[in-house]
């Protein structure tokens, strides 16, 4: 299974991979907005345990939490939260995966969320850390 975020139509696609043929098959396509909203996909990350996928929407300034079905890899929306900035270009999970840091390209700030390891849900901790024109977030 692979998870793909599409920038121009702000969708997340769930793909299965056939190792024999070297091909992908689209299993699902999830819109991150309604048709009348302008949106651009940003970043996407899968937790190490494979239980949650997180995606950002740069046009709608939001983060999406999806749970992963362990049997087929399909996604279910768990939560949508405001990213508390403009154009959440990138985000990253901390090494212990207890936190997510979001970098905003237009509002020049980082947002810090605490992540519930059981439910995947995010809680805002800080939204006003100055960081000019962020395009990538890499934890140490």
Write out the residue ranges for each language-model feature.
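Acidic, glycine-rich loop-and-beta core segments that form the ion-binding/anion-interacting portion
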Residues: 1-30
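A short beta-strand motif characteristic of beta-propeller blades
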Residues: 27-35, 76-82, 123-128
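C-terminal hydrophobic structural anchor segments
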Residues: 64-113
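Short loop/turn segments immediately following beta-strands, especially the blade-tip
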Residues: 15-23, 66-73, 114-121
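A detector of repeated loop/turn-to-beta-strand junctions in beta-rich toroidal repeat architectures
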Residues: 9-11, 60-62, 75, 107-109, ...
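Blade-level signature of beta-propeller repeat domains, shared across WD40, Kelch, NHL, RCC1
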Residues: 105-114, 123-140
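Beta-rich, blade/repeat-based domains predominating
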Residues: 1, 33-50, 84-99, 131-140
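Conserved beta-strand positions in repeat-built beta-propeller and related beta-rich domains
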Residues: 4-8, 55-58, 102-105
């Amino acid at each position: 299974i692979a998870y793909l975020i599409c920038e121009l139509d702000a969708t997340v696609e769930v793909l299965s991979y056939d190792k024999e043929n070297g091909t992908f098959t689209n299993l699902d396509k999830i819109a991150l907005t309604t048709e009348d909203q302008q949106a651009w996909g940003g970043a996407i990350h899968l937790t190490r345990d494979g239980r949650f996928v997180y995606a950002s929407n740069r046009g709608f300034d939001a983060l999406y939490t999806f749970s992963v079905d362990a049997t087929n890899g399909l996604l279910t929306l768990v939560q949508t939260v405001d990213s508390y900035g403009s154009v959440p270009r990138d985000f990253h999970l901390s090494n212990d995966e207890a936190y997510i840091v979001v970098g905003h390209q237009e509002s020049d700030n980082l947002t810090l969320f605490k992540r519930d390891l059981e439910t995947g849900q995010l809680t805002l901790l800080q939204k006003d850390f100055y960081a000019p024109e962020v395009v990538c977030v890499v934890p140490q």
